[in-house]
Protein backbone atom coordinates (compact mmCIF):
# COMPACT_ATOMS: atom_id res chain seq x y z
CA UNK A 1 0.00 0.00 0.00
CA UNK A 2 2.79 2.45 0.91
CA UNK A 3 4.60 1.70 -2.35
CA UNK A 4 1.45 2.35 -4.39
CA UNK A 5 0.83 5.65 -2.60
CA UNK A 6 4.45 6.65 -3.11
CA UNK A 7 4.29 5.84 -6.83
CA UNK A 8 1.01 7.76 -7.18
CA UNK A 9 2.56 10.85 -5.58
CA UNK A 10 5.68 10.53 -7.70
CA UNK A 11 3.58 10.24 -10.86
CA UNK A 12 1.57 13.32 -9.91
CA UNK A 13 4.74 15.25 -9.07
CA UNK A 14 6.29 14.28 -12.41
CA UNK A 15 3.14 15.32 -14.28
CA UNK A 16 2.94 18.68 -12.50
CA UNK A 17 6.63 19.32 -13.07
CA UNK A 18 6.31 18.57 -16.78
CA UNK A 19 3.22 20.76 -17.13
CA UNK A 20 4.94 23.70 -15.49
CA UNK A 21 8.18 23.33 -17.42
CA UNK A 22 7.64 26.49 -19.41
CA UNK A 23 5.35 28.50 -21.58
CA UNK A 24 4.48 27.04 -24.96
CA UNK A 25 6.21 28.57 -27.94
CA UNK A 26 4.33 30.62 -30.48
CA UNK A 27 3.05 28.80 -33.54
CA UNK A 28 4.30 30.26 -36.79
CA UNK A 29 2.90 29.39 -40.21
CA UNK A 30 5.26 27.87 -42.74
CA UNK A 31 5.29 26.39 -46.23
CA UNK A 32 7.62 23.65 -47.42
CA UNK A 33 9.00 25.05 -50.67
CA UNK A 34 11.30 22.19 -51.59
CA UNK A 35 12.73 19.01 -50.12
CA UNK A 36 16.38 18.16 -50.73
CA UNK A 37 18.08 14.77 -50.39
CA UNK A 38 20.18 14.18 -47.27
CA UNK A 39 22.06 11.34 -45.62
CA UNK A 40 19.53 10.14 -43.03
CA UNK A 41 22.30 8.58 -40.93
CA UNK A 42 23.99 11.98 -40.41
CA UNK A 43 23.31 13.33 -36.91
CA UNK A 44 23.33 16.99 -38.00
CA UNK A 45 24.53 19.44 -35.35
CA UNK A 46 25.47 22.44 -37.50
CA UNK A 47 24.61 23.47 -41.05
CA UNK A 48 25.83 26.35 -43.24
CA UNK A 49 24.99 27.25 -46.83
CA UNK A 50 28.05 28.85 -48.49
CA UNK A 51 29.10 29.24 -52.15
CA UNK A 52 26.22 27.02 -53.27
CA UNK A 53 27.28 24.16 -50.98
CA UNK A 54 26.20 22.89 -47.59
CA UNK A 55 28.77 22.53 -44.84
CA UNK A 56 27.56 20.18 -42.13
CA UNK A 57 28.82 19.25 -38.68
CA UNK A 58 27.65 15.83 -37.54
CA UNK A 59 27.76 14.36 -34.06
CA UNK A 60 27.86 11.03 -32.21
CA UNK A 61 30.98 9.50 -30.75
CA UNK A 62 32.89 7.53 -33.37
CA UNK A 63 30.84 9.09 -36.19
CA UNK A 64 31.39 12.86 -35.96
CA UNK A 65 32.43 14.62 -39.17
CA UNK A 66 32.71 17.89 -41.02
CA UNK A 67 31.17 17.49 -44.47
CA UNK A 68 30.87 19.45 -47.69
CA UNK A 69 27.59 18.43 -49.33
CA UNK A 70 26.04 19.06 -52.74
CA UNK A 71 22.56 20.33 -51.82
CA UNK A 72 21.00 19.18 -55.12
CA UNK A 73 22.02 15.53 -54.82
CA UNK A 74 22.84 15.14 -51.13
CA UNK A 75 26.21 13.69 -52.14
CA UNK A 76 29.03 14.18 -49.65
CA UNK A 77 31.77 15.82 -51.73
CA UNK A 78 34.41 15.93 -48.98
CA UNK A 79 34.49 14.75 -45.41
CA UNK A 80 36.79 15.15 -42.39
CA UNK A 81 36.36 12.60 -39.61
CA UNK A 82 36.80 13.82 -36.06
CA UNK A 83 38.66 11.65 -33.54
CA UNK A 84 36.48 8.77 -32.31
CA UNK A 85 36.35 10.19 -28.79
CA UNK A 86 34.99 13.57 -29.97
CA UNK A 87 31.31 14.52 -30.43
CA UNK A 88 30.90 17.20 -33.11
CA UNK A 89 28.47 20.04 -32.45
CA UNK A 90 27.74 23.56 -33.78
CA UNK A 91 29.32 25.05 -36.90
CA UNK A 92 29.94 28.65 -37.99
CA UNK A 93 31.73 30.41 -40.85
CA UNK A 94 33.86 33.53 -40.38
CA UNK A 95 36.49 34.91 -42.82
CA UNK A 96 36.56 31.69 -44.86
CA UNK A 97 37.20 29.64 -41.73
CA UNK A 98 34.82 26.98 -40.46
CA UNK A 99 34.65 26.73 -36.67
CA UNK A 100 33.33 23.44 -35.26
CA UNK A 101 32.44 22.98 -31.60
CA UNK A 102 32.80 19.79 -29.64
CA UNK A 103 30.23 18.83 -27.05
CA UNK A 104 32.16 17.85 -23.91
CA UNK A 105 35.75 17.64 -25.13
CA UNK A 106 36.64 21.30 -24.60
CA UNK A 107 37.79 21.95 -28.18
CA UNK A 108 36.92 24.14 -31.13
CA UNK A 109 38.35 22.95 -34.45
CA UNK A 110 39.12 25.48 -37.20
CA UNK A 111 39.19 24.54 -40.90
CA UNK A 112 39.93 26.30 -44.16
CA UNK A 113 36.53 26.51 -45.92
CA UNK A 114 38.14 25.95 -49.35
CA UNK A 115 40.04 22.77 -48.50
CA UNK A 116 38.53 21.49 -45.20
CA UNK A 117 42.10 21.25 -43.93
CA UNK A 118 42.48 21.77 -40.20
CA UNK A 119 44.22 25.10 -39.60
CA UNK A 120 44.00 25.18 -35.82
CA UNK A 121 42.07 24.53 -32.66
CA UNK A 122 41.22 26.39 -29.49
CA UNK A 123 40.28 25.32 -25.97
CA UNK A 124 36.64 25.78 -24.96
CA UNK A 125 35.56 25.99 -21.34
CA UNK A 126 32.39 24.00 -20.67
CA UNK A 127 30.14 22.28 -23.16
CA UNK A 128 29.73 23.33 -26.78
CA UNK A 129 26.20 23.23 -28.19
CA UNK A 130 25.35 25.89 -30.76
CA UNK A 131 27.65 28.22 -32.69
CA UNK A 132 26.92 31.29 -34.81
CA UNK A 133 28.90 34.06 -36.50
CA UNK A 134 27.50 37.55 -36.01
CA UNK A 135 29.00 41.00 -36.57
CA UNK A 136 32.58 39.74 -36.56
CA UNK A 137 32.13 37.60 -33.45
CA UNK A 138 31.46 33.95 -32.74
CA UNK A 139 28.60 33.21 -30.35
CA UNK A 140 28.64 29.94 -28.38
CA UNK A 141 25.74 28.38 -26.50
CA UNK A 142 26.29 25.68 -23.90
CA UNK A 143 22.78 24.48 -23.06
CA UNK A 144 22.26 27.10 -20.36
CA UNK A 145 20.70 30.57 -20.68
CA UNK A 146 24.16 32.03 -21.30
CA UNK A 147 25.65 33.09 -24.63
CA UNK A 148 29.40 33.70 -24.86
CA UNK A 149 30.93 35.99 -27.49
CA UNK A 150 34.43 35.26 -28.83
CA UNK A 151 36.91 37.06 -31.05
CA UNK A 152 37.44 34.55 -33.90
CA UNK A 153 41.19 34.86 -34.63
CA UNK A 154 42.28 34.07 -31.07
CA UNK A 155 39.02 32.66 -29.68
CA UNK A 156 39.29 35.11 -26.80
CA UNK A 157 36.15 35.54 -24.70
CA UNK A 158 34.97 39.14 -25.05
CA UNK A 159 31.47 39.11 -23.53
CA UNK A 160 28.78 36.98 -21.91
CA UNK A 161 25.04 37.56 -21.90
CA UNK A 162 22.15 35.78 -20.21
CA UNK A 163 19.07 35.42 -22.39
CA UNK A 164 15.89 36.24 -20.47
CA UNK A 165 12.17 36.13 -21.03
CA UNK A 166 11.16 39.02 -18.83
CA UNK A 167 13.08 38.38 -15.63
CA UNK A 168 13.43 34.61 -16.15
CA UNK A 169 16.55 33.10 -17.76
CA UNK A 170 15.78 31.01 -20.87
CA UNK A 171 17.59 27.67 -20.39
CA UNK A 172 18.76 25.06 -22.91
CA UNK A 173 19.84 27.50 -25.61
CA UNK A 174 21.31 25.73 -28.59
PLM-predicted stretches and their roles:
Residues 69-74, 112-116, 151-155:
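Short loop/turn segments that connect beta-strands within beta-propeller blades
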Residues 35-40, 79-84, 120-126, 161-171:
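Surface loop/turn motifs at the tips and blade-to-blade linkers of beta-strand repeat domains
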Residues 16-18:
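C-terminal motif of bacterial Sec signal peptides marking the signal peptidase cleavage site
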Residues 51-52, 95-96, 135-137:
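Short coil/turn segments that connect the beta-strands within blades of beta-propeller domains
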Residues 42-46, 86-93, 126-134, 169-174:
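Repeated scaffold domains used in trafficking and secretory/extracellular systems
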Residues 22-41, 71-77:
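A short helix->beta-strand "capping" segment at the edge of beta-propeller domains
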